[in-house]
From Swiss-Prot:
Gene transcribed to yield this protein: ruvA
Superkingdom as given in the UniProt entry: Bacteria
SUPFAM superfamilies reported in the protein's UniProt record: DNA helicase RuvA subunit, C-terminal domain, Nucleic acid-binding proteins, RuvA domain 2-like
UniProt protein name: Holliday junction branch migration complex subunit RuvA
Chain spans, region Domain II: 65-139
Region (Flexible linker): 139-143
Molecular function in Gene Ontology: ATP binding; four-way junction DNA binding; four-way junction helicase activity
Family annotation (Gene3D superfamilies): 5' to 3' exonuclease, C-terminal subdomain (1.10.150.20), DNA helicase RuvA subunit, C-terminal domain (1.10.8.10), Nucleic acid-binding proteins (2.40.50.140)
Native species: Paraburkholderia xenovorans (strain LB400)
CDD domains according to UniProt: UBA_RuvA_C (cd14332)
GO biological-process terms attached to the record: DNA recombination; DNA repair
NCBIfam families: ruvA
Region (Domain III): 144-193
Length: 193
């Protein structure tokens, strides 16, 4: 599976990207939240990815943050929610807005996302209750542990650690720690664990 992609951004046509990785062009679909934060074409881009293999296609979905990818994966576990619908949800609201919506059980807010009706919204709320909030709570704890938590987390993911291991390690990094020192502290915590 392809879990991360780094290369030169060749094309941007919402929500599709073409990323050149050493001469190989990868087509990647991204949520609009990631799309709006992309660099200009011709510049280097790094995306966390989720590869989906279907009978008729191999599809690659890209995300700017680990929490977006984790939420995408949770959405895919829900019956009747495919990759396109999950991408639409993440394009229609941020991960934190989705977590608030799930916590408040606000089906009306979810129905504003194109393609989601009342029944689908209710199923999403039921299935995500207790899952998405727990993930975000862990990530919020990691983010408060360091000003550079996202960069440290992405570095650990790039080194092959699981999201769970990386989040636990980032929690041990004191606030105000720089990225390189934070990575060292996180790696030290991982080696002890």
């Amino acid at each position: 599976m392809i879990g991360r992609i780094a290369g030169v951004l060749l094309e941007k046509n919402p929500p599709h990207l073409l990323v050149d990785c050493n001469g190989v062009g990868y087509e990647v679909d991204v949520p609009m939240s990631t799309f709006y934060n992309l660099p200009s074409t011709g510049e280097r881009v790094v995306l966390l990815t989720q590869m989906i293999v279907r009978e008729d296609a191999h599809l690659l979905y890209g995300f700017g943050t680990a929490e977006e990818r984790s939420t995408f994966r949770e959405l895919l576990k829900i019956s009747g929610i495919g990759a396109r619908m999950a991408l639409a949800v993440l394009s229609g609201m941020s991960v934190h807005e989705l977590a608030q919506t799930v916590t408040m059980q606000d089906a009306a807010r979810l129905t504003r996302v194109p393609g989601i009706g009342k029944k689908t919204a209710e199923r999403l709320l039921l299935e995500l209750k207790g899952k998405i909030g727990a993930d975000l709570g862990a990530m919020a704890g990691a983010a408060s542990a360091s000003d550079h938590a996202s960069d440290i987390l992405n570095a650990l993911l790039a080194l092959g650690y699981s999201e769970k291991e990386a989040l636990a390690a980032v929690k041990n990094v004191p606030a105000g720690t720089g990225v390189s020192e934070g990575i060292k502290l996180a790696l030290k915590a991982l080696s002890k664990g």
